[in-house]
């Protein structure tokens, strides 16, 4: 096969079109016999192949997003490998566009198939962004919240751009109150409270009973070790369980904006003022990377693994 003559100007043009390295551009032009368009496709394919390798790395950074449209809200989480990417405008636009679509779908599978503004599916667009951004990206989860009447409050903590940040919260208030502005303001305050206090459930009944029993057992054993008489251990355990509920149950927590009142008391006062019942139907709190286990390896372990392998 005869040597293909590749000009420096072709290499430069291909680099400008793709942002790929000089040597990669030269190799692509040689492989495609100097055809610039085919060389672009060659590099794109190569980029996507590299992205497939990146998929083995843990993506625990990134962004969460909250979007509200009337009486419907959605929270999404999209992960990257480094915090640096979260400040990348291209990644921020990707997350925003996905959140805008998520509000109209029912689950993550439907979201992956939804069409982005560029005509590609969400799943396809994420893969292309893996290639161009150069990190593994994962559309991890989404959840929709709806109320039939009332208000939805949203709050994003540590915002890096509009509605994008480390923690995203939605709170649904069901109410027939006519003053929607005050209802929305209350929903927003409760959303801020949820971000800061991280409740586990709205009320007692929503708590995982296995968790409650585990706490009860710990308190019981601790009281026994302290040498307390059996006749008062049960009272002490019940007192500690009540304190535990006050720490993790939303309605029993002291309100972030007025710690002399519980959230339940704040809602009761607002209902009286607005002349209609108010009920928290649901809250969603996404904290970036929660529950993702990051595998830690040191350099010596990595070398040993390669030598074995």
Swiss-Prot record:
The organism sits in which domain of life?
A: Bacteria
The protein's GO terms of the molecular function aspect are: translation elongation factor activity
Q: Where is the protein localized?
A: Cytoplasm
Q: Which UniProt keywords apply?
A: Cytoplasm, Elongation factor, Protein biosynthesis
**Where does the record place the region Involved in Mg(2+) ion dislocation from EF-Tu?**
82-85
Supply one GO CC term from the record: cytoplasm
CDD domains reported in the protein's UniProt record: UBA_EF-Ts (cd14275)
Task: Give the function comment from the record.
Answer: Associates with the EF-Tu.GDP complex and induces the exchange of GDP to GTP. It remains bound to the aminoacyl-tRNA.EF-Tu.GTP complex up to the GTP hydrolysis stage on the ribosome.
Give the family this protein belongs to, as stated in its UniProt record. Belongs to the EF-Ts family.
Could you identify this protein by its name?
Elongation factor Ts
The organism's lineage is: Bacteria, Pseudomonadati, Pseudomonadota, Alphaproteobacteria, Rickettsiales
Q: Which gene encodes it?
A: tsf
């Amino acid at each position: 096969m005869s040597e293909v003559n590749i000009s420096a100007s072709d290499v430069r043009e291909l680099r400008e079109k793709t942002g790929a390295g000089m040597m990669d551009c030269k190799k692509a032009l040689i492989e495609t016999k100097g055809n610039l368009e085919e060389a672009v496709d060659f590099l794109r394919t190569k980029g996507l192949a590299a992205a497939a390798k990146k998929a083995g790395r843990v993506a625990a950074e990134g962004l969460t997003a909250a979007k509200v449209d009337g009486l419907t809200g959605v929270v999404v989480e999209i992960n990257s490998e480094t915090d640096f990417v979260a400040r990348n405008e291209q990644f921020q636009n990707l997350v925003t566009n996905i959140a805008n679509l998520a509000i109209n779908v029912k689950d993550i599978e439907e979201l992956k198939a939804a069409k982005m503004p560029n005509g590609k599916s969400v799943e396809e667009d994420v893969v292309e962004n893996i290639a161009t951004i150069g990190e593994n990206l994962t559309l991890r989860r989404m959840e929709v919240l709806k109320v039939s009447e009332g208000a939805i409050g949203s709050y994003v903590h540590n915002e890096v751009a509009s509605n994008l940040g480390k923690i995203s919260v939605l709170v649904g208030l069901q109410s027939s109150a006519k003053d929607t502005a005050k209802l929305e303001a209350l929903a927003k305050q409760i959303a801020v409270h949820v971000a800061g206090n991280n409740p586990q459930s709205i009320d007692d009944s929503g708590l995982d009973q296995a968790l409650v029993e585990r706490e009860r057992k710990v308190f019981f054993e601790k009281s026994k070790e302290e040498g307390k008489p059996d006749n008062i251990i049960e009272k002490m355990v019940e007192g500690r369980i009540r304190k535990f509920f006050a720490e993790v149950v939303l309605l029993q927590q002291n309100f972030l904006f007025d710690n002399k009142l519980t959230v339940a008391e704040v809602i009761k006062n607002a209902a009286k003022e607005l002349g209609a019942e108010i009920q928290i139907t649901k809250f969603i709190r996404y904290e970036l990377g929660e529950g993702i286990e990051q595998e830690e390896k040191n350099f010596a372990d990595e070398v040993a693994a390669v030598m074995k392998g």
